[in-house]
C-alpha cells in the first residue's frame, strides 16, 4: 500500500502549471533497520486509486535501483530497466539513473512493479526515486 499512498499524495497535490517534485527512497531488507517495522492486517484494496484514477498528467522521473550484496547486481538492474521499457515509460539512461516519462499512473505502476520484483528476488534492495511535474527546466 506504500505506492498507493505516495501516488495518492502526489496526484492530489498536483496543480496545473505548478512545478512540484517528490524525492523518495524505498528500501527493504536493510540489516539492523527493523525498529519501525510492523505488520498491519490489510487487504489488497488500493484505497486512493478510486479517488485519483481520473487525474491525468505527465511526469518525469529518475530512478536508481540498488540490489545490495548481489554479485550479479547488473542483471537485476537490467531487469528493472527492461520492465520500464516494456511498459513504455523508459525515456533514456543517464549517469547512474534511468529516466522515466509518462502518465503519473503508468510511472507509479512501474515503480510498484520494480519494488515487487525486488521483494520477490532480492533480500536487500533500495529504489531511489525523483518525480517531477511542470518543471521550468528541461529534465
Cite the ranges covered by each PLM segment.
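Charge-rich, low-complexity N-terminal segments
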Residues: 1-139
Amino acid at each position: 500500500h506504500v505506492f498507493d499512498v505516495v501516488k495518492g499524495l502526489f496526484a492530489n497535490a498536483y496543480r496545473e502549471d505548478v512545478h512540484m517534485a517528490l524525492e523518495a527512497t524505498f528500501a527493504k531488507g536493510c540489516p539492523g533497520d527493523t525498529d519501525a517495522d510492523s505488520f498491519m492486517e490489510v487487504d489488497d484494496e488500493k484505497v486512493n486509486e478510486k479517488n485519483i484514477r481520473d487525474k491525468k498528467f505527465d511526469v518525469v522521473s529518475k530512478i536508481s535501483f540498488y540490489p545490495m550484496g548481489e554479485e550479479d547486481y547488473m542483471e537485476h538492474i537490467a531487469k528493472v530497466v527492461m520492465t520500464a521499457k516494456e511498459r513504455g515509460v523508459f525515456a533514456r539512461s543517464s549517469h547512474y539513473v534511468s529516466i522515466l516519462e509518462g502518465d503519473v499512473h503508468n510511472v507509479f505502476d512501474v515503480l510498484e512493479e520494480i519494488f515487487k520484483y525486488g521483494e520477490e528476488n532480492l533480500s536487500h534492495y533500495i529504489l531511489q526515486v525523483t518525480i517531477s511535474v511542470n518543471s521550468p527546466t528541461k529534465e
